[in-house]
Each structure stands twice: as C-alpha cells, then as structure tokens.
A protein has these predicted regions:
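Bacterial Sec-dependent N-terminal signal peptides
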Residues: 1-33
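A short, structured surface patch at a secondary-structure boundary
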Residues: 69-170, 174-180
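Hydrophobic/aromatic ligand-binding patch that stacks against planar heteroaromatic rings
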Residues: 5, 126, 167, 189, ...
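Extracytoplasmic substrate-binding proteins
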Residues: 164-167, 174-177, 183-264
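Short, structured coil segments at secondary-structure junctions
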Residues: 132, 153, 193-194, 279
Length: 281
C-alpha cells in the first residue's frame, strides 16, 4: 500500500477555496466600464476568466462577474465604495448617473464589510485565512464548518437551501456570500432584504488557480489585500503539480457527497476535475 504525502499548506489552501472538499472579462488594460460608469484601470488577472475588477482611483472599485452559464452575458456587478463622508458623496453621484437599463444586477457595497452571513464553508475558511473572521456574523450549513472559533461564536442561519430569514435579519449583515446556481430563478426572500448578495461563482472558473484568484475580490470586500496569500498558493500549487507528474497514476479519489438521492460528481473540465488531473489522480 502506497503512502502519499501531501503538502499541508497547499492542502489547507485547497480546502478553504472549496477545491479539495470542496469575465469572460469585459476588457483589458484601460477599461471603460459599462452603464455610464467612469473609465478606470483594470486590475490584472492571471488565471480568473469570469472576474474583472476596475479601479477608479481611491473613490471606488467596480467588480464585474461574467455569467459562466451564458456566454457573453453578465452575472452581477458590484460597486465597492469606502465608508465615510466622501464615500457617501460617491454613492450619490454614481446613483444619479447609473443607467436604468443596466445589463445585469448592480449592488453598491460599502467597504470594509464588518458583518456578513456566509453560506459556504470554503469561504468561511478563506475569510479566516485573510484575517477577517470577525466579520462573519452568521453561517449556513454550520455542520460543514470545521473552524472551532467560528462554530462557537457565529449564529447558525440554517441550511443554505432554506436559510432562516428571521435570524439573518436580526444580524443586520452588510453582505451575504452565497453560492449561485444555474437557472436558480433568484434568491427568493433573500432578494427582498435589500442586502447586497455576493454571488460567489468562483467554483465555475476554468482552473483551480482561476478559482483561487477570486480571493482578491473577496479580500477587497473586507479591506484585506489577498495578493500575498494568492502568490504563496500559486507557487505551492505549481510546485506540487510538477511533483505529481512524476508519480505513478492510478490513485482513486472519492469526491463530493450525496445530496438527497443524488451523488453529484465533478466534470472533467471543472475546477475539481482539473485539480485531480493536476494531482495525477
């Protein structure tokens, strides 16, 4: 029986991104944002294909999510505006200029977010690693979260499929981090709370490192710079990928879990499928 030793650090990184348990971009370089927004500077993305971030000086950052299920369309757009008097003025100015015919849902998020409800375990782990665990006020699917501090401290908001709306309201969160699905038809009662819904569609990226790069967006929500953390993960991942190529193939891997009467498995071109391929499994 062969023993396989896994680098603890990359395993931990893969876990919190949802990789192991687990836009089509608008334009590049100088970018003209849509819907009457100012032109700004695009933040370079090395791997992510469904995420575009445009920096507009110190006033605000525009984040655009491509719809991974319908090519050429947008899933959501976020305007991240710092809190404070100047931020208030920016919000007012942008609201007056925003076109009524926006191509996708647009939410303004005041940063840093200090209270949130997180619907997935991997994103809880990421926030923990980024040093913003105190911004987690509530979670869904608490049984799948293995961080002692979070399990002890935060409010259980029920199942991610049937969240406890009253508990969420009582927490007065500034943002909800949810995992979107194709043809979901919206978020029901959550849509009526008028709380920004952060659609964490990173799992639909075209590569594991593309998925990991979304931490740059999540970090901005909480005023945390994720560049250094991402660089370490990238280096570790590529190093282990090189090592894995030299190992004999044939390792069997059991993925996901049973949901109802169905046991879903990742497709070969999904982030999990590519991860397993890179691990030579």
């Amino acid at each position: 029986m062969k023993k396989i030793f896994i680098n603890h650090r990359i395993f931990k990184a893969a876990l919190f991104l949802g990789i192991a348990s687990l836009l089509v971009s608008c334009q590049v370089g100088k970018t003209q944002a849509g819907d009457n927004m100012d032109a700004g500077d695009t933040i370079p993305m090395k791997y992510a294909q469904h995420l575009t971030m445009v920096k507009h000086g110190e006033e605000y950052t525009e984040v655009i999510l491509a719809n991974p299920w319908k090519e050429g369309t947008l899933l959501h757009r976020y305007i991240l505006v710092p809190k404070g008097k100047e931020g208030n003025e920016t919000v007012t100015r942008l609201a007056l200029r925003r076109a009524s015919s926006a191509r996708c849902a647009t939410d303004t998020v005041r940063t840093p977010v200090t209270s949130s409800v997180v619907f997935t375990g991997p994103h809880c782990q990421l926030m923990y690693e980024l040093g913003c665990k105190n911004a987690i006020s509530g979670v869904c699917d608490k049984n799948y979260i293995n961080i002692p501090d979070i399990r002890k401290r935060v409010v259980d908001c029920g199942s991610s499929m049937q969240p406890d709306i009253e508990r969420i309201i009582s927490l007065k969160p500034e943002a909800l981090l949810v995992s979107p699905f194709e043809n979901s038809g919206g978020y029901g009662k959550l849509d009526k709370l008028h709380i920004p819904i952060i659609e964490a569609a990173d799992y639909m990226e075209t590569s594991p490192l593309g998925r990991a790069e979304w931490m740059k967006f999540y970090g901005m929500l909480f005023d945390k710079n994720a560049d250094s953390l991402f660089t370490h993960i990238e280096q570790d991942y590529l190093h282990l990928k090189t090592i894995a190529k030299k190992l004999p193939q044939g390792l069997s891997v059991l993925t996901e879990r049973k949901t109802g009467s169905v046991w879903y498995v990742p497709g070969g071109q999904s982030t999990i499928g590519i991860l397993l391929k890179d691990a030579n499994a």
